């Protein structure tokens, strides 16, 4: 680069340093994209822009990537390290280098022909200033928005702080040369493929153009399904057609989002400021999956777990900062209060009632609106649990919106729909105190402005946040595998309900819950809470707590729950220091050392965080319980216990393994527990290691309350085989409440109605209860005896005294 060019770029860079604050996607491009900086790297940009080039340069230097302004020297030849696909418009159009990119591609390919050891990594990069999709009427939205110098100046001035540099996976020019040749035609194809790549990338980042709201309503009103529903409304309520149509429009006003890019920008600024003060970090994993789906043209439906009202904002914020379009979000109608409702609506929220029953017009309007979102190509987000979890565990899925998603596919004409499960985790949930009150019987407080202000005023240090993207579920692939003739049900007008729809939706919903849990995130708070709640007095010395966290961490790292699950990289001591900063625990100091205490009033609240990762530790906890209670146990006996109890654990906690996989899981966990010296193995028999009995007992406590719950139900069933399912659920809850009082069990989910409902359903599915409702007394008594050996004698006596008291 000549001296004059250096001066030119330095002068041009001065205003950019002030105006532009760009973000790199991914955050660590070399690491996440597997770039080898020891090999030559060249950058491909969509169009000629020095502002884009200098913005790219700033990110390259910040991430130790080669400087795009430094040319590549190959065998004495100097070649630019960057290529512009389009020359781009200028204020004066007398010069447009149309063939420049093709010539450079050809030069690079030609060098590979002459140098067999050469392998240049070609990295496509898009630099975007602003992401407004524009409106449908009167605007054009080309695949590559090329701006002349003056337009670019205003874009950078206004949108420089809302810019990002998106690095794509590199392409090996060696592979291109070897597989396709090096002539000019290949260079032209390479340029054409690059143009298509950037067009798709822009659509993924910006999304389709937005319709005028009234135009959208007019289109919905003109649909045959809503027109028929309006006629039915007029006839059934004996009102005029105009009045029925007004009712339909009112429902559209109630439901529909009013997406605003300017509101997204403003909220991003506010949230960025807020997150930096409330959170110590937002940890995002596997986002590249979603970026690839968006790039490949999939219709994405985000399906996160629901912990908090914060979920709406956090996920949209994360997606926006991953270079993706924030989705249209299905929000409960309870959030449609001033001023939150109008704000959420402009951020993409569309509102949904708790029930559709008895209102055909509403269900038709909602279904048609959802179908229109899909047909226009907008990403959508909804919470398949239906509401926020009050216990920290996943709730049983509500399948209404999921069913409508599949019905939208049965209309035909939509892009391939892919469901993306998402695990959201927090070290502090602002509503957790309210959840505990509601579980104790308090009436749910209606969402309102005063409640929102009170909640916001209490926000302090929220620790870390976690957003883990799970394994995507492509709907078309799933239907092709499980319902091969599903296309026969396609009807472009009517919402069809083929016989296979309900069982298929239920199966997909259960699969999604498993995939959400597969992406679980262990953190300092839920690990410390798990250990402290496992101790009888909710307190451990710092040394004991450190040892127990080391045990959990080794299990999670060496025998990971799933490939998508994450465990902290920090040491146990560092995690404890971090957890203490959250001000949830008390520390008593004496001459020997620190004692870390979970105060009684905090214990119930902290079960929420323990439950977030209960599924990740329940299997090692069950094995630990077997060893601590039996002292000596053969592998075959362990496997028999596990195979008997696993169906109930799987249904309750949405565990991932099938029965055939259990032997391998058990062997891997036994090997890890042996490595940690928690157990001793002699031939085929495993025994407790007395020198590590405390760690094993604390690990076993993770399954203690679950096993007690199962023991209650199996005892009631064996004592009264003719008991009906409803009575079994009710009596099980009553005994569980009694047990919690007598034995100091502070977990609200211990007597949760939904937990016992799932347990009783699984009893039927596993054949312990016949279709007529009677139990199999021999089988139920056999399982009860197995469970009775795994719980303490005082708890067992309390359970067995119930029927004796009744007698």
Swiss-Prot record:
Q: Which pathway does the protein contribute to?
A: Phospholipid metabolism; CDP-diacylglycerol biosynthesis; CDP-diacylglycerol from sn-glycerol 3-phosphate: step 1/3
Q: List GO BP terms, alphabetically.
A: CDP-diacylglycerol biosynthetic process; fatty acid metabolic process
- Enzyme Commission number: 2.3.1.15
SUPFAM superfamilies named in the record: Glycerol-3-phosphate (1)-acyltransferase
Task: Classify the protein's membrane topology as the record does.
Answer: Peripheral membrane protein
UniProt catalytic activity:
sn-glycerol 3-phosphate + an acyl-CoA = a 1-acyl-sn-glycero-3-phosphate + CoA
Q: Which InterPro entries match?
A: GPAT/DHAPAT, GPAT/DHAPAT_C, GPAT/DHAPAT_LPLAT, GPAT_PlsB, Plipid/glycerol_acylTrfase
Q: Where is this motif: HXXXXD motif?
A: 305-310
Q: Which GO terms describe its molecular function?
A: glycerol-3-phosphate O-acyltransferase activity
User: If you read the UniProt record, what top EC class would you report for this enzyme, in one word?
Assistant: transferase
* Keywords (A to Z) from UniProt: Acyltransferase, Cell inner membrane, Cell membrane, Lipid biosynthesis, Lipid metabolism, Membrane, Phospholipid biosynthesis, Phospholipid metabolism, Transferase
Subcellular location field = Cell inner membrane
Q: List the GO terms this entry assigns under cellular component, sorted alphabetically.
A: plasma membrane
Signal peptide boundaries:
none
Q: Name one Pfam family in it.
A: GPAT_C
Q: What is known of its domains?
A: The HXXXXD motif is essential for acyltransferase activity and may constitute the binding site for the phosphate moiety of the glycerol-3-phosphate.
Assigned protein family: Belongs to the GPAT/DAPAT family.
Q: What is this protein called?
A: Glycerol-3-phosphate acyltransferase
Species of origin reads Klebsiella pneumoniae subsp. pneumoniae (strain ATCC 700721 / MGH 78578)
């Amino acid at each position: 680069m000549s001296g004059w060019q250096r001066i030119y770029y330095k002068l041009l860079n001065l205003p950019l340093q002030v105006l532009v604050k760009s973000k790199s996607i991914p955050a660590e491009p070399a690491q996440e994209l597997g770039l080898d900086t020891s090999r030559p790297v060249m950058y491909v940009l969509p169009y000629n822009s020095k502002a884009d080039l200098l913005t790219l340069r700033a990110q390259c230097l910040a991430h130790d990537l080669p400087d795009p302004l430094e040319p590549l020297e190959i065998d004495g030849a100097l070649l630019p390290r960057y290529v512009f696909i389009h020359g781009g418009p200028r204020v004066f159009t007398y010069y447009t280098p149309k063939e420049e990119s093709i010539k450079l591609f050809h030069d690079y390919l030609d060098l590979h022909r002459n140098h067999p050891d050469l392998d240049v990594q070609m990295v496509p990069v898009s630099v975007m200033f602003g992401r407004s999709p524009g409106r449908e009427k009167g605007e054009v939205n080309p695949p590559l928005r090329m701006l002349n110098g003056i337009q670019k100046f205003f874009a950078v001035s206004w949108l420089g702080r809302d810019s990002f540099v998106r690095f794509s996976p590199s392409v090996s020019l060696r592979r291109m040369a070897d597989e396709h040749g090096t002539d000019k035609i290949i260079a032209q194809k390479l340029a054409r493929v690059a143009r298509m790549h950037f067009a798709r990338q822009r659509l993924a980042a910006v999304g389709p153009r937005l319709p005028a709201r009234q135009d959208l309503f007019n289109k919905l009103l003109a649909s045959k399904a809503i027109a028929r529903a309006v006629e039915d409304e007029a006839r059934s309520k004996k009102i005029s057609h105009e009045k029925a149509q007004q009712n339909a429009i009112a429902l559209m006003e109630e439901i529909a989002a009013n997406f605003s890019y300017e509101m997204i920008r403003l909220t991003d600024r506010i949230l960025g400021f807020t997150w930096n003060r409330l959170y110590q970090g937002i940890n995002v994993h596997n986002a590249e999956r979603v970026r690839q789906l968006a790039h490949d043209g999939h219709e994405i439906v985000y399906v996160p777990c629901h912990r908090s009202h914060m979920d709406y904002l956090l996920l949209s914020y994360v997606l926006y900062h991953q270079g993706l379009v924030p989705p249209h979000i299905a929000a409960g109608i309870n959030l449609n209060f001033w001023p939150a409702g109008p704000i959420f609506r402009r951020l993409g929220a569309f509102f949904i009632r708790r029930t559709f029953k008895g209102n055909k017009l509403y269900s038709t309007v909602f279904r048609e609106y959802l179908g229109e979102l899909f047909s226009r190509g907008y990403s959508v987000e909804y919470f398949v649990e239906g509401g926020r979890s009050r216990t920290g565990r996943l709730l049983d899925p509500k399948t209404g919106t999921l069913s409508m998603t599949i019905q939208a596919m049965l209309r035909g004409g939509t892009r391939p729909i892919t469901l993306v499960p998402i695990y959201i985790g927090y070290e502090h949930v602002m509503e957790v105190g309210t959840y505990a009150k509601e579980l104790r019987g308090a009436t749910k407080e209606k969402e309102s402005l005063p409640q929102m202000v009170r909640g916001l005023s209490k926000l302090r240090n929220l620790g870390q946040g976690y957003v883990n993207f799970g394994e995507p579920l492509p709907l078309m692939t799933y239907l092709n595998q499980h319902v091969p003739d599903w296309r026969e049900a396609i009807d472009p007008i009517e919402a069809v309900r083929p016989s296979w729809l309900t069982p298929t939706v239920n199966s997909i919903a259960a699969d999604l819950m498993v995939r959400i849990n597969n992406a679980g995130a262990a953190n300092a708070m839920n690990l410390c809470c798990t250990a402290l709640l496992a101790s009888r007095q909710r307190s451990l010395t710092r040394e004991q707590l450190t040892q127990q966290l080391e045990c959990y961490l080794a299990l999670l790292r060496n025998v990971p729950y799933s490939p998508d699950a994450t465990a902290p990289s920090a040491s146990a001591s560092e995690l404890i220091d971090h957890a203490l900063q959250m001000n949830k625990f008390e520390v008593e100091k004496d001459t020997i050392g620190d004692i870390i205490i979970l105060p009684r009033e905090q214990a119930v609240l902290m079960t929420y965080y323990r439950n977030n990762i209960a599924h990740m530790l329940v299997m090692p906890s069950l094995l630990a319980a077997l060893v601590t209670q039996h002292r000596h146990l053969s592998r075959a006996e362990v496997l028999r216990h596990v195979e008997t109890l696993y169906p109930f654990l799987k249904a309750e906690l949405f565990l991932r393994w099938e029965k055939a996989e259990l032997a391998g899981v058990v062997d891997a966990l036994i090997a890890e527990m042996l490595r940690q010296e928690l157990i001793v193995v002699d031939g085929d028999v495993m025994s407790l290691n007395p020198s590590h009995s405390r760690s094993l007992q604390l690990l076993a406590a993770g399954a203690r309350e679950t096993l007690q719950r199962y023991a209650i139900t199996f005892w009631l069933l064996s004592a009264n085989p003719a008991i009906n399912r409803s009575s079994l659920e009710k009596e099980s809850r009553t005994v569980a409440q009694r047990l919690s009082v007598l034995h100091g069990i502070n977990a609200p989910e211990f007597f949760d109605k939904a937990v016992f409902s799932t347990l009783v359903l699984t009893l039927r599915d596993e054949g312990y209860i016949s279709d007529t409702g009677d139990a199999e007394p021999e089988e139920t008594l056999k399982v009860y005896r197995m469970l009775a050996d795994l719980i303490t004698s005082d708890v067992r006596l309390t359970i067995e005294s119930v029927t004796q008291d009744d007698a």
